[in-house]
């Protein structure tokens, strides 16, 4: 976002994280809103910085600010053959201000919640909604209850994909998180004591558990997102859970309403169905 607005190569942008001495307070990364909120804040900061640099370039090139363009890190006024490099413009700007500091911020806009006041936690209203569709292919071993995810297909609407490789990786990570929630991760208690209090019993998926994941990035344009972007996180996590249970129901004819769908629960459900079938009176033919 910053590089796009300033017309710079991405390698010039360095992100400083976790240093409260030089960056403002941040409430954290959650609620599938970071690209939307941080992206818009960065967009505003970049535009403020662009105004500073444009004015400096105008002084150096003896032109009007509105005539200044920056292409390939070279500032030019109109059809001038010779322009000023990014370094020259920054040097010119430093003469006026010393260290150049700009800020940008973003607050949830009223349109996000129907123009009305909203109540709840301090995270604010939802700015935009993403959409995700998922297909999960599974194999179920009815002798052991083990469910194996063979392949996952995901289509995720993230608005404008600012970085397609990052979006693809984010969606894949969301599928893994959904796998953990749906298949193995459980905060189980017995007599008030947590019995899954270590990483052996509270099992999270590893790369060994990962099936092939085919990601389809569906681009749309959110009118309030930075360059039209939305989230690419929890949407693909949430879609895995019902897709998995529907796939299991299709495979063995048993629907699960409790998560995680562990092997013991699958085996118990299969045994329960078998015992019920044995107890039910057999149908006999007759006239």
Locate predicted features.
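Cofactor-binding beta-sheet edge motifs in enzyme active sites
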Residues: 1-287
């Amino acid at each position: 976002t910053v590089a796009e607005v300033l017309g710079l190569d991405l390698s010039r942008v360095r992100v400083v994280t976790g240093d409260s001495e030089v960056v403002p307070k941040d409430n954290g990364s959650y609620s599938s809103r970071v690209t939307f909120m941080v992206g818009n804040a960065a967009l505003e900061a970049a535009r403020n910085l662009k105004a500073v640099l444009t004015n400096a370039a105008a002084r150096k090139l003896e032109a009007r600010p509105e005539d200044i363009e920056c292409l390939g890190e070279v500032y030019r006024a109109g059809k001038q053959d010779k322009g000023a490099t990014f370094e020259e413009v920054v040097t010119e700007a430093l003469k006026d201000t010393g260290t150049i500091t700009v800020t940008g911020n973003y607050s949830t806009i009223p349109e996000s919640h129907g123009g009305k006041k909203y109540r709840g936690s301090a995270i604010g209203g939802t700015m935009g909604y993403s959409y995700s569709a998922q297909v999960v292919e599974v194999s179920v071993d009815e002798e052991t209850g083990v469910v194996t995810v063979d392949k996952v297909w995901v289509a995720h609407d993230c608005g404008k994909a600012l970085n397609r490789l990052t979006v693809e990786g984010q969606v894949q990570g969301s599928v893994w998180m959904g796998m953990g929630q749906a298949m193995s991760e459980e905060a189980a208690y017995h007599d008030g004591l947590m019995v899954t209090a270590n990483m052996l019993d509270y099992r999270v998926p590893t790369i060994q558990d990962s099936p092939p994941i085919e990601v389809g990035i569906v681009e749309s344009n959110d009118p309030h997102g930075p360059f039209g972007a939305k989230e690419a996180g929890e949407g693909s996590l949430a879609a895995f859970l019902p897709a998995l249970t529907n796939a299991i129901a299709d495979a063995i004819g048993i629907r699960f309403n409790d998560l995680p769908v562990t092997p013991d629960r699958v085996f118990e459900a299969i045994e329960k169905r078998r015992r019920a079938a044995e107890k039910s009176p057999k149908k006999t033919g007759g006239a």
